């Protein structure tokens, strides 16, 4: 079917949160047998990705975390996750593992929950094929500035994949990108350009009660518009205004491009 329609596969996603076995975690589960199943599942996903000529497996360790104090030993959990992801990454170097962070849900507190911690984790694996998926909505939920997160991850060389959506910073609503945080999105698009990001940008949106096809159409329309505005920005002019510390001159300039 892919060949018939001239399509490629952006990523293979490994879900280690939906099945009952992952209720109390996957790569950080206290039982070694469950952790082994998580590692084996990652290796299988990497094999499937290679078969599809797809360079990346994405995974969000969202059941790896806690709901209550004293529920886990954090040092053990972090070490288990490192060991498991490192083993999977060493299994085949031709496929990247891109790990997605999130502050909470389904766990009250996810173990890998912000850009800095996720980048550090990726570095600690000591594997070049381990990196980070930056979900714009998750960055908002973690009270990050998405452009800052993109710039930071881009500079570390660990920005492997991007999800676009939007929310009010109170929950991961997966709304059409730019409909709530337009300023942040324009700055985010500029940051991706500045770090030279050339990977996939995936629409991670949820239709709620609206027509799914229209939601996807609007996602593409809004993202095209956002990147068009970002492309209009004279980076030399912007940098000079930033040196002069005139915030409202900057905002007026960006507003003139809308």
Q: Whereabouts are the PLM-identified features?
A:
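Active-site acidic/histidine proton-transfer and metal-coordination neighborhood
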Residues: 4, 11, 21-131, 252-257
